[in-house]
Amino acid sequence: NILSELVLSFRDDFAKYRNKVPSSRIDATFRSIAEQGLGKFVYNRVDTDASTAQIKTATETLILAGLVYPVTHSSANGIPLGAEINEKYRRMILLDTGLLQRILNLDISVILSSDDIQVVNRRAMAEIFVGTELVKSASCYSPYPLYCWHREKAGSNAEVDYVVQLGTRIIPIEVKSGSKGTMQSMRLFMEAKGITQGIRTSLENFS
């Protein structure tokens, strides 16, 4: 299987970076990024006895290698979006949905056809797909930073999956893995920022 061979090849290559951090730490971090899926990436959830500093180094190594893309919170009050980031809140996505499927041993036919099985994994795959498509749409000569917006408030957390800059405009993107789902977070964001346009991706047909 090509995907299995790719995963094995990546893991073999981790040994090249052992002068920075042991390859076993990188491998554990790589798998944890796949397993954690949605939401903020939590370093102490990596299944290893390594220190947080080592896990952070392993994560940055994976980012520099292009195997992982960070999605960083931006307050998004204006452009550039990178001017108001908070790296304490970052999601991590793999570079490919097929790799996520293989690492987690997921049955892709079940995920695509079922309405209620493995919903978390399906949502993660949808977010990865949109994020990687955003990266592909940019120039190959410079890294394309991914941003999100997150608000933590007692009883009223909110998150917009992606926030992008289009010319001088800020556009929120809400990712839905099915045909249903509210857009409360995006509406809240748009009202707070005075934005009139946003994008919602889902399995719904165009109307």
Residue ranges and their predicted role:
Residues 23, 49-52, 124, 128:
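Short, solvent-exposed loop/helix junctions and linker helices
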Residues 5, 38-45, 71-72, 78:
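Short, charged, low-hydrophobicity "junction" segments
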Residues 12-17, 42-45, 111-120:
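Short hinge/gating elements
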